[in-house]
């Protein structure tokens, strides 16, 4: 009797999805993917509003709700907002959504660790230049710190962030970071301590080339508080 290798067949099925250069989340939203130094990365930010099991993620619609989610370690997302209004194309997550066991990343992908982000930066030529390479060609306040990437595959846009402690976020409509900054969560807590209130993030800024990466593995800062609202990119799982 012929034995069918289920793992092999599943691998082929997954690879066929991969070759189509698209991934789909539980809400039906599709994401393009691109190979960057041997790894498959999403080329746009995650924008899902439900976990993989179908349960809704809490949407915070005020600073009070955002702070409540952080204080109680509740997974939450919000739209970016500033004095010009609400940007409903930009979804920001707190770290508790990133780490929730119900699963934020689309099937077949995962949220990268601090180590995976560091490896990406190294493969792009180092922390000093990786930030400029990862930026989108448009949207930033200045093009002085963009480094030529003909493929422009990562395409990180300056969509802004939401900080739980900074004065700039004390007013829900006072973001002041769109066009200047963007941050991406890693799945790694500071010191690998899940009880810590801080986690590693990777940041890009309009006025520097380097990738802001919290190189000090024990750094705890208001800038990497788990209650902050940052963007998320996912990496395609490597098949065995």
Predicted features by range, described:
Residues 1-21:
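Bacterial Sec-dependent N-terminal signal peptides
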Residues 21-240:
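Conserved positions within compact, well-structured domain cores
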């Amino acid at each position: 009797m012929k034995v069918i290798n289920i793992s092999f067949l599943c691998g082929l099925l997954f690879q066929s999805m991969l070759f189509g250069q698209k991934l789909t989340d539980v809400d039906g939203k599709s994401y393009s993917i691109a190979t960057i130094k041997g790894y498959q990365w999403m080329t746009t930010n995650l924008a899902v509003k439900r976990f993989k099991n179908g349960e809704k993620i809490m949407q915070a619609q005020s600073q009070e709700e955002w702070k409540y989610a952080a204080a109680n370690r509740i997974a939450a997302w919000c739209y970016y907002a500033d004095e010009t209004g609400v940007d409903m194309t930009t979804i920001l997550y707190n770290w508790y959504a990133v780490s929730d066991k119900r699963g934020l990343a689309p099937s077949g992908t995962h949220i990268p660790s601090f180590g995976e982000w560091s490896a990406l930066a190294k493969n792009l030529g180092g922390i000093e230049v990786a930030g400029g390479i990862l930026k989108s060609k448009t949207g930033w306040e200045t093009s002085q710190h963009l480094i030529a990437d003909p493929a422009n595959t990562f395409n990180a846009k300056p969509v802004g962030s939401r900080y739980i402690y900074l004065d700039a976020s004390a007013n829900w409509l006072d973001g002041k970071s769109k066009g200047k900054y963007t941050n991406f969560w890693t799945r790694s807590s500071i010191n690998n301590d899940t009880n810590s209130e801080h986690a590693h993030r990777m940041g890009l800024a309009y006025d520097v080339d380097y990738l802001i990466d919290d190189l000090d593995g024990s750094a705890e800062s208001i800038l990497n508080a788990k209650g902050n609202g940052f963007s998320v990119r996912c990496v395609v799982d490597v098949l065995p």
